Amino acid sequence: MEGGGMTTIPGFNQIQFEGFCRFIDQGLTEELSKFPKIEDIDQEIEFQLFVETYQLVEPLIKERDAVYDSLTYSSELYVSARLIWKTSRDMQEQTIFIGSIPLMNSQGTSIVNGIYRIVINQILQSPGIYYRSELDHNGISVYTGTIISDWGGRSELEIDRKARIWARVSRKQKISILVLSSAMGSNLREILENVCYPEIFLSFLSDKEKKKIGSKENAILEFYQQFACVDGDPIFSESLWKELQKKFFQQRCELGRIGRRNMNRRLNLDIPQNNTFLLPRDLLAAADHLIGLKFGMGTLDDMNHLQNKRIRSVADLLQDQFGLALVRLENAVRGTICGAIRHKLIPTPQNLVTSTPLTTTYESFFGLHPLSQVLDRTNPLTQIVHGRKFSSLGPGGLTGRTASFRIRDIHPSHYGRICPIDTSEGINVGLIGSLAIHARIGHWGSLESPFYEISERSTGVRMLYLSPGRDEYYMVAAGNSLALNQDIQEDQVVPARYRQEFLTIAWEQVHLRSIFPFQYFSIGASLIPFIEHNDANRALMSSNMQRQAVPLSRSEKCIVGTGVERQAALDSGALVIAEREGRVVYTDTDKILFSGDGETLSIPLVMYKRSNKNTCMHQKPQVQRGKCIKKGQILADGAATVEGELALGKNVLVAYMPWEGYNSEDAVLISERLVYEDIYTSFHIKKYEIQTHVTSQGPEKVTNEIPHLEAHFIRNLDKNGIVKQGSWVETGDVLVGKLTPQVVKESSYAPEDRLLRAILGIQVSTSKETCLKVPIGGRGRVIDVRWIQKKGGSSYNPEMIRVYILQKREIKVGDKVAGRHGNKGIISKILPRQDMPYLQDGRSVDLVFNPLGVPSRMNLGQIFECSLGLAGSLLDRHYRIAPFDERYEQEASRKVVFSELYEASKQTANPWAFEPEYPGKSRIFDGRTGNPFEQPVLIGKPYILKLIHQVDDKIHGRSSGHYALVTQQPLRGRAKQGGQRVGEMEVWALEGFGVAHILQEMLTYKSDHIRARQEVLGTTIVGGTIPNPKDAPESFRLLVRELRSLALELNHFLVSEKNFQIHRKEA
């Protein structure tokens, strides 16, 4: 990096790797060193662990086997332990197994119970003290100092109009700072000696106050009385002091090492770093600063500045869990020692320690903790972006409903650290974000960003990583790094940042400059070409929608890209990379044999594996037999990658024009070519599973002999009752035949069964059919069947059978497609290719977008990409465009697009590609009539993605199904075969049309009128007219009963239609 100023993009999984390595190297040692010596009550036995000699054993199973058999890919932790009998001076030392720790794989994820999981980083308010000012109801500024502990607990210091200082211990209760300082161990003389304004402290010290702080015990009693809201006069005791320590001091006064560092820096203190608790000296210095603010001295804090935030990385979260597990282990060891002494047994270190606390703690953490999530594996991009997310939610953090707009907003300190674009939409906007490409987590949990230092003394370029707050003291040139590397004129002025302000200064005044055009953005935003021409809201949608793109059966590289595609594919783990030099011996669809350094390696390839979003993960060999390869070369492409580059969509011919209203309001018109030539065809793999239990009537049985089922439905079962691999199955077919034993009541026995029971005493048991069947929309090819048998075979460890079915899905009406600029739409019609508009060279258009979707959304990047893609397809070129190219010259993007179109029109003899009267547009023809359209139309080849929101997963209908027990109304949701809700506004719409009978049907027969819907079923079978309902529906009867529970009686009558007679009827 010296000299040329060149830099490489860091590995996208680096943050996860560094966090896990820090946990293994430092976190384990730190927590083990805190494990105390354990002694029994009589101090006869002493047990201790040795930190220096812990060992992590390499796992016995491979990652692939862990996924296949639903196991945890973990390493066993062994620690040396010593047990000393003090009476006989005997000593035993053993290396003991204390539990398993899930390991991180090469993609930065963990495999727990066969499921890929990832721990995302959490961003929290950093512990320390923060000063802010608010206006009270009289418009007077009120200054407060908030002390945040390492656990997230908060205490506030306030100064009132009379310059009296209070510590707020709860929402309603506050106490004098003198009382709190005295309760923490300071006397009045020490307080006055350690403050800058002793006269102010003396001014609000009354005789009553002097009595309260006369001794530490009095101060503790006063503090306890205020904190616990206790009436009367409590008496000082050790238990009272312990309760106060547990409820207040431990939760709100433990600063931690980061909090101690922040407190020392903010208040100019020199307290040692190992003193991590709040001291009276801290309180008094904080009060001094508060008095200074009252008199116009000192500065307030910006709570949303990144220097006041910290990242809880994977290392911190795993270390916390390890500490929790050791506390549980300590309690278990104490209990075992007491039990052994009581029963006069001689324990060994191995007998004292159990692996359950550590193993179960990590299993529950990965399974239940909000920051441990199932890895999203829709496509390779989704995997790497998931690991770089951060969240403000979770334990100790914010909630989506209480977070303010200021917390969610972009801050100048985010520059180069947090992406200003990539965040979730909806209630969590601004709370869940993505780290910028070059950001890294520093030693103190701060986010650091790299800059190049500009020095007059040396010609070389030095790269610095600066934490938030430090870069504010430098003039940072925000220009494009490639442009700044050129010869700079003496009088050149450049845009720069200084103390959160943007300035234009001379080049000689610049201290630092950014290193990369993508430095400010996340991976998702960095994949958008011409992002500078898009509105930020549309760029946000695009970076989210790229993560929803489905890997296609035949992937294709984008013509117009940004250059980050290769790195994204490389770090995703979708590719197979050569780890050494060598020669390819043999290639097949499922493996590559590779010889190097005198040994032959077999590299297995992923074949039709299911991701957790039901997409298909598949690897294809890219090398031929006998070819010599170098280290780092690509051996096989994965899903959605081509030649080692990310390939999420297809380059298709698009026209921006209205077409008979079929593309209004974000609808998209497509050609049947996309269906018949499998342009947007994708494979999806669904998993169906069933368990066999041991019931009270006996074990469930897997068999192919299922009574009362047509042979057609069980045609694909083998002799064991499990579907054959390779079978084609349709809706309703049995995948696994299973019978569950059940005892039937005697009254329902057949006569011959009763006779057998009476004469021979044979108990006749019948079985219920509980087969696994193909649900609606589940048709496809069975590609894999797994019978997982857990060790032990008890009823608590049931056997599990999993069936995987592959579906081939062409694009169809109702599917969602999107570009890379937030331009999304639903397929509305599939036209025959002869009816689609066609170009002057006879080619028909593939997609028709609505031009009205561009100006109001201000995502003009799609126009540049569209035209440049057309030029690239004609010239057979690929372009990689860095963002913000206008910094080279004015209108740089437009110039490069027009110059390439002009070159394409000349070189390929297609003059229509660039027409000077309307550059970028062309006259095209109506496929139905052959006549040209009145206006020239924008045509091009953008990169269009097919998203995972597919109509096959969403379309749903119900004729009959399950009803809720209380309301007797149909259930809700596609998964429960539920009904469509007719709400209040839908009723108004039907009333407006005057369709009284349809409305009555909706609210009675099709909803919750039990008798009426039974009659409908009968009349449908027999024929005839459907009778009108004679009484109130179930929901009305429910309302009457609920009112009765409130002691309100609703008198209601039913009026006859014929003679208007009133009939009283009990609801």
UniProtKB/Swiss-Prot annotation:
Catalytic activity: RNA(n) + a ribonucleoside 5'-triphosphate = RNA(n+1) + diphosphate
Coiled-coil annotated spans: none
Function: DNA-dependent RNA polymerase catalyzes the transcription of DNA into RNA using the four ribonucleoside triphosphates as substrates.
GO molecular function terms listed in the Swiss-Prot or TrEMBL record: DNA binding; DNA-directed RNA polymerase activity; ribonucleoside binding
Cellular component aspect of the GO annotation: chloroplast; DNA-directed RNA polymerase complex; mitochondrion
Family per similarity comment: Belongs to the RNA polymerase beta chain family.
Descriptive protein name: DNA-directed RNA polymerase subunit beta
Entry's Gene Ontology BP terms: DNA-templated transcription
UniProt lineage: Eukaryota, Viridiplantae, Streptophyta, Embryophyta, Tracheophyta
Keywords: Chloroplast, DNA-directed RNA polymerase, Nucleotidyltransferase, Plastid, Transcription, Transferase
Subcellular compartments: Plastid, Chloroplast
Family annotation (NCBIfam families): PRK00405.1 (NF001616)
Enzyme Commission number(s): 2.7.7.6
UniProt entry tagged with the keyword Nucleotidyltransferase: yes
Pfam family, one: RNA_pol_Rpb2_6
Disulfide bonding pattern of the chain: none
HAMAP family: RNApol_bact_RpoB
Oligomeric and partner information: In plastids the minimal PEP RNA polymerase catalytic core is composed of four subunits: alpha, beta, beta', and beta''. When a (nuclear-encoded) sigma factor is associated with the core the holoenzyme is formed, which can initiate transcription.
